[in-house]
């Protein structure tokens, strides 16, 4: 009889020791050789077989903007053949973690330690990764890698400023904290610390420091990831969270969201520690890449190179 263990709720609950008896997946194929298929989980497919819609028919029913449509992890597992037939060798998943209501895209996270029920379960994710790693095409091994989209710059809209007002960045001023929107979120519980957030209000200048590294992206609350004791606590917690998901799901890489809004040192520490942990599991080719959207070459240059240009971390 299989006993399902509850999801952890604290950093202290996370077991990062390799799963006994498990051989973690590794393939020495160059990442530059991969053909990566990106999909938004909710918009891809569920596990139900459907005919292709014709004319004005909609295979997913009535379209409701800014809401979930029903795609899930089992639907991806069921359609690995389709992805392989396109010639793809790796799958990049949108964030799988539990989100606030209506956040079908996955970037409004309120629980980093559990899979969003709209998408399935942790076991569904494990099964998908296992199926991708062991996939066969035309009777021959065709291992596909799986990449998770991860967020380390901000949490979801899990708390509000005092008075419930909408604050905007101004002269790097810290604004007063109101309260968390739910008594049981965010998770892990360590994220229920108002000092772990910059609290500068919404940014309007997305390309110039310090606003672009201290301000909130719309309602998403920016983590305090500066080079100080608080920032070290935040980034260390995020490192452990994502090491946990490598251990549990055996994923092969991370795409890091909103990199230009993260301090260079925090980004370097995260990247180096993630790669080192993956290596201890035998995953020698763990891949990390990040999102930078900017017209400024200077911003790109700050994050290019081994561990970035400010990688003097201890």
Segments predicted by a language model, with ranges:
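N-terminal module-boundary/linker segments of secreted carbohydrate-active enzymes
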Residues: 1-40, 152-154, 166-168, 173-180, ...
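N-terminal structural segment of carbohydrate-active enzymes
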Residues: 2-145, 155, 214-216
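Extracellular/periplasmic catalytic domains that process cell-envelope and extracellular macromolecules
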Residues: 28-33, 84-87, 92, 133-141, ...
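Aromatic- and acidic-residue-enriched segments that line the glycan-binding/catalytic groove
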Residues: 32, 53-56, 101-115, 152-210, ...
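Short, solvent-exposed turn/loop segments enriched in Gly/Ser/Thr/Pro and often Arg
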Residues: 41-43, 92-102, 148-159, 258-263, ...
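Short, acidic/polar
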Residues: 70-82, 228-248
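Short acidic catalytic loops
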Residues: 88-96, 112, 145-154, 237-238, ...
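Active-site-proximal helices and loops of the catalytic beta/alpha 8
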Residues: 133, 240-243, 247-314
């Amino acid at each position: 009889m299989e006993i399902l263990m509850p999801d952890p709720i604290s950093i202290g609950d996370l077991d990062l020791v390799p799963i006994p008896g498990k051989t973690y997946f590794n393939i020495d194929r160059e990442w530059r050789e991969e053909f990566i298929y990106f999909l938004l989980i909710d918009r891809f497919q569920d596990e139900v077989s459907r005919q292709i819609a014709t004319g004005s028919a909609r295979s997913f029913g009535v379209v409701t903007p800014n809401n979930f449509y029903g795609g899930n992890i089992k639907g991806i597992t069921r359609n690995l053949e389709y992805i392989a037939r396109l010639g793809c060798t790796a799958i990049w998943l949108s964030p799988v973690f539990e989100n606030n209501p209506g956040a079908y895209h996955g970037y409004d996270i309120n629980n980093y330690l559990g899979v969003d029920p709209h998408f399935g379960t942790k076991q569904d994710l494990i099964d998908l990764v296992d199926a991708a790693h062991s996939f066969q095409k035309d009777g021959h091994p065709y291992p596909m890698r799986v990449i998770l989209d991860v967020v380390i710059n901000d949490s979801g809209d899990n708390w509000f400023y005092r008075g419930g007002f909408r604050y905007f960045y101004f002269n790097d001023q810290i604004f007063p904290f109101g309260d968390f929107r739910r008594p049981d979120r965010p998770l892990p519980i360590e994220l229920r610390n108002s000092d772990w957030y910059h609290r500068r209000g919404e940014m309007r200048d997305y390309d110039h420091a310090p606003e672009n590294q201290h301000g909130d992206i719309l309602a998403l609350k920016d983590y305090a990831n500066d080079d100080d004791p608080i920032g070290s606590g935040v980034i260390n917690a995020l490192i452990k969270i994502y090491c946990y998901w490598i251990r549990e799901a055996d994923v092969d890489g991370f795409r890091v969201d909103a990199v230009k809004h993260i301090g260079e040192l925090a980004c370097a520490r995260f990247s180096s520690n993630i790669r080192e942990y993956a290596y201890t599991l035998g995953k020698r080719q763990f891949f990390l890449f990040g999102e930078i959207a900017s017209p400024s070459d200077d911003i790109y240059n700050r994050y290019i190179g081994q561990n970035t240009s400010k990688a003097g971390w201890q």
